[in-house]
Amino acid sequence: MLNPTVRKFQYGQHTVTLETGMMARQATAAVMVDMDGTAVFVTVVAKKKVKEGQDFFPLTVNYQERSYAAGRIPGSFFRREGRPGEGETLIARLIDRPLRPLFPEGFLNEIQVVATVVSVNPQVNPDIVAMIGASAALSLSGVPFNGPIGGARVGFIDGQYVLNPTVDELKISKLDLVVAGTAGAVLMVESEADLLSEEQMLGAVVFGHEQQQVVIENINALVAEVGKEKWDWAPEPINQSLHDRIAQLAQTRIGDAYRITEKQERYEQIDAIRDEVISTLLAEDESLDEGEIIEIFSGLEKKIVRARVLAGEPRIDGREKDMVRALDIRTGLLPRTHGSALFTRGETQALVTATLGTARDAQTIDDIMGEHTDTFLLHYNFPPYSVGETGMMGSPKRREIGHGRLAKRGVLAVMPTIEEFPYTVRVVSEITESNGSSSMASVCGASLALMDAGVPIKESVAGIAMGLVKEGENFVVLSDILGDEDHLGDMDFKVAGSRNGVSALQMDIKIEGITREIMQVALNQAKSARLHILGVMESAISQPRAEISEFAPRIHTIKINADKIKDVIGKGGSVIRALTEETGTTIEIEDDGTVKIAATSGEQAKQAIARIEEITAEVEVGRIYNGKVTRIVDFGAFVAIGGGKEGLVHISQIADKRVEKVSDYLTMGQEVPVKVLEIDRQGRIRLSMKEAQATQQEAAETSSEDPAN
């Protein structure tokens, strides 16, 4: 007998319902979460046994949107959902990031979280709903999980923070920030902002964390009521004698190796020490597990580096805690691209290009929240050679999609509107070297490449990655972290922005006890680093180039009467197709009569504009046109006079004398001057060849009598 347990609570302006016990009863745990009509069904399956040889924690989070949730049938050929889209991948990462640090070290059992959107209210984003569901399902499952977590979206409208703003409210919000955390700690922040201050950003984080406590309280209450028994799990006991022996063999040498500033040389030295330790220990005792030796060795590395940082010693590459690595900036280095830049910060390097296209190059995104068009694209590629490795090349992985979206958030606030700059813009960041903070290098490179392309961005933006090492009350914030410092630290966060404020903030915290004061110190230190980088960038290029590249399309905009759109398009698109082919341009027409002509030369654009103006021009009574005979009939001839207009030259209006047979005077396709005599109420046009001839003759005689001639 199905006996669901339901819990309902108010969360800001929304009502949230948690329900369990109705569906997916063979899963370890399952929860249906509903927030005002947006419902996400979340399941957790956890393996009781660890796979043999497993040396990492195999947590998988899958997020999938079903078209039926929005009352639609998929538009694909097979009429069913395919592989996850970019949006689904980003939300899966958003859920994964705050959950992963809450599993105890040494827990290696496989866990899969599946979140399926089954109903959607177009005003309520499903990502926060899915995050709440994942937290609830894991908490109910009994697995060793130090949750639950809450999730909240924070907007900033009219100077006030707004909890879980609707889709319409987000359109007018200066902030879109998602924060997740436990009852006592913030774990994850993901945001984009319209150049807000550090204080406003931090205030939003604190506000969201405070407001989400109601979610945590209700999940705890649900667990108390129907939660499964906690697993009887404990970490493997520490082999202290092996720890001591490895420290004896390697501690001093590891410390010396981490004084080598060049990454590849340092890695080679560490690898050599590790291999020697493994060989020595296995020679002493063949029963030892190589995986355990490597794990203890890695822990010793982390301990040594952290102790040096906390003691105030120079960092791995010799820098002080607040120093940014050496910068090298070059722009315009690729001759045929529309804009390019090479941004190098230490051993991290990004080759970034900007390409300008027309409206038809925009990306149409059709998901369960509706269809929308994106005219600014930023793609991030991380090839294996950037870290001196070999590997598979193919479609972008989750990490590349996530880093690209973060970099895009960092630049979005300074991009011009489509009205200010009617181009689709694509930025591509190729990471050619990597040793920490390649996504923030992409922000810097994107800003430089956009300026090089002549895109009128409001101001330069730069990004910086920060780290934190904390033991007890002692903590050190590190600016511009290396890859090793990211791995060994307790918090890493990335801040992008201009001189006037923050455009993007991403934060991942691995420990509890990170206070508001620590985050404030970190944000202030990040601001100093960002301003330093901006200064160097502005010395390379301080404002967008006055002209776009000669290889980029020029977009010219004209306005026509909306009633004339059909004339420019023609039957079956015949007129506009001929226009584009004959002038070598791309023409786009909007419903309000706005016409955008993209051409690589000014002459092409002039030709297209002249043709369109000719087509859409109103026929004037008394004006003489050069027409073309399109049809000959017994009583006269029909003549096209441009603009898709055609008029009749009656047989009596062909010549001054009597005309017996029209074909004696006119042939098909013949070009003749005609004068508009009348346009009747039905729009029919009466033309005259003899009146046109008389008017032209009179004008010629007047001209010859003019003394100036």
Swiss-Prot record:
Keywords annotated in UniProt: Cytoplasm, Magnesium, Metal-binding, Nucleotidyltransferase, RNA-binding, Transferase
List the catalytic activities from the record: RNA(n+1) + phosphate = RNA(n) + a ribonucleoside 5'-diphosphate
What EC designation does it have? 2.7.7.8
Question: Pfam families, alphabetically?
Answer: KH_1, PNPase, RNase_PH, RNase_PH_C, S1
Q: Where is this region: Disordered?
A: 690-709
As for subcellular location, the record says: Cytoplasm
Enzyme class, first EC level, given as a word: transferase
Q: Which residues bind Mg(2+)?
A: D486, D492
Q: What does this protein do?
A: Involved in mRNA degradation. Catalyzes the phosphorolysis of single-stranded polyribonucleotides processively in the 3'- to 5'-direction.
What's the protein name? Polyribonucleotide nucleotidyltransferase
